[in-house]
Amino acid sequence: RERGATLIHISTDYVFGGDGNVPRREDDPVRPLGVYGRTKLAGEKAIAEAGCDALILRTAWLYSEFGNNFVKTMLRLTAQTPRVKVVFDQAGTPTYAADLAGAIHRMISSGAYRGNEGTYHFSNEGVCSWYDFAHEIAVLAGLDPARVIPCHSEEFPSPVERPRYSVLDKTKIKETFNLTIPYWRDALERCLERLGAQTAGTAI
């Protein structure tokens, strides 16, 4: 604030509860179910209380060709094991980190962020379950998609409660910054191409 800089804060779809089946808007009520969502929401509130200019970007199901993430885990498991169970009753939208970074770069480099500070949602376009995502990873990587088996969340008991529906409405960010957001399957294909896994069918 003292330097007149704009803060960029990456937040999460997990600030919302899991009820409903309508994409979440930026002004929808928040109700985080777990510690992760609560800490991210606390960060959003701290920024608001500080009174600094900020862009708060809520994203979801983030992955890339770098580090450890769901895509690389599914590539490894599907290549090495005969059956991989993945939940089909949690819906959201994957986000390719390169697309998120590209959107942020455009927002900053164009100068359009000035006067448009606030909270925005960004993920790739479309909706899928974790099972749909894992199945498509196998298909595009040249692995056997029949190894990916759908299951209920109850088959994976966990102390961490996750929202059953956390699709983000991206109308605001698209209209404010004139963004065209790629569909999640197209983004996944680009990531796999960069990993060199689309036709190789090898473990990562």
Residue ranges and their predicted role:
Residues 103, 110-159, 199-204:
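Mid/C-terminal beta-alpha module of Rossmann-like enzyme folds, strongest
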